[in-house]
Amino acid sequence: MVQNIAILGASGYTGAELVRLIATHPAMRIVALSGDRKAGMAMSEVFPFLRHLDLPRLQKIEEIDFSSVDLAFCALPHATSQAVIADLPRDLKVVDLSADFRLRDPAAYETWYGKPHAAPELQKEAVYGLTEFYRDEIRGARLVAGTGCNAATGQYAIRPLIEAGVIDLDDILIDLKAGVSGAGRSLKENLLHAELSEGTHAYSAGGRHRHLGEFDQEFSKIAGRPVQVRFTPHLTPMNRGILANVYVKGDPQAVHRALAERYLTETFLEVLPFGALPSTRDIRGSNYVHIGVIGDRVPGCAMVVAVLDNLCKGSSGQAIQNANLMLGLDEAEGLRLAPVFP
């Protein structure tokens, strides 16, 4: 049975990535696309690379008839999804790609996002969408909150190590490099080619990046006590991709073994042989995560390197993976795409 899909916020990067992936999904059909500022336009006018697809025109959200929609992806900007999802039919399954429902604690949301949550009841209902760790909850969920792309990368490298008890919880450092598409499609001076090309810079440094809220929430939940990591992201002049260097105290072989055993049966998570390190070029355009482990010159320390595509596994691909579970489909349906190389 083919499921009818609506994509709200289809004129942004994550919305376009949803369209690209769902176009070849055997059990999903796009029946509605929203883009309020571009309502009435064809998707091919906004994204010419989608010209060959037969897609509905962009509409305003209030113009969409949700009575025939089985699931909606909400790819709207942060702080916008709360009111929009609150107004959707209560029986409609929703996967939200924004930050609006990732944090379970209303106080934590206000701390990291600077304003009270406008839909606290939905915040309590939402299931955190890190698929490989919440798939049972996701199967029965009505609302799933997509993870932050940086938060997902770091968690794939660290969560099994906390679960296995093989690292010092008080000494975790994440040094992360991210592609520019993670900053969205709106015009910003610092994202102009002349400003960004041939350079890289740290941003939201000093413990200010909002994805730290997800690290705090998830790592503390696993450990059963507060866990805080040090995390600094860097913006790099590539379109797609995230590379996280994670520095931990723990036996390197034990670290590698914990990751390899935890992800042995996972479709999209691959742990490389000990000493091999991954590259963002090898997962570009795909839903795969590659993880490598190497020892450090300091005895008893290890470095874990994780890479993923921020638009795919870090956002839209993972959203479809979650939607597959919510709709009773094969979790990997429509997502077994080979990476784009070179």
Swiss-Prot record:
Domain of life: Bacteria
First-listed, main subcellular location of the protein, grouped into a coarse class: cytoplasm
Pathway where it operates: Amino-acid biosynthesis; L-arginine biosynthesis; N(2)-acetyl-L-ornithine from L-glutamate: step 3/4
GO MF term set: N-acetyl-gamma-glutamyl-phosphate reductase activity; NAD binding; NADP+ binding
Enzyme Commission code: 1.2.1.38
InterPro entries given in the database record: AGPR_type-1, NAD(P)-bd_dom_sf, NAGSA_dehydrogenase, Semialdehyde_DH_NAD-bd
SMART domains tied to this protein: Semialdhyde_dh
CDD domains the record matches: AGPR_1_C, AGPR_1_N
GO cellular component: cytoplasm
Keywords: Amino-acid biosynthesis, Arginine biosynthesis, Cytoplasm, NADP, Oxidoreductase
Catalytic activity entry: N-acetyl-L-glutamate 5-semialdehyde + phosphate + NADP(+) = N-acetyl-L-glutamyl 5-phosphate + NADPH + H(+)
Active site: 149
Keyword GTP-binding: no
Protein's cellular compartments: Cytoplasm
GO aspect biological process, one term: L-arginine biosynthetic process
Function statement: Catalyzes the NADPH-dependent reduction of N-acetyl-5-glutamyl phosphate to yield N-acetyl-L-glutamate 5-semialdehyde.
PANTHER family documented for this protein: N-ACETYL-GAMMA-GLUTAMYL-PHOSPHATE REDUCTASE, CHLOROPLASTIC-RELATED, N-ACETYL-GAMMA-GLUTAMYL-PHOSPHATE REDUCTASE, CHLOROPLASTIC-RELATED-RELATED
Family affiliation: Belongs to the NAGSA dehydrogenase family. Type 1 subfamily.
Listed name of the protein: N-acetyl-gamma-glutamyl-phosphate reductase
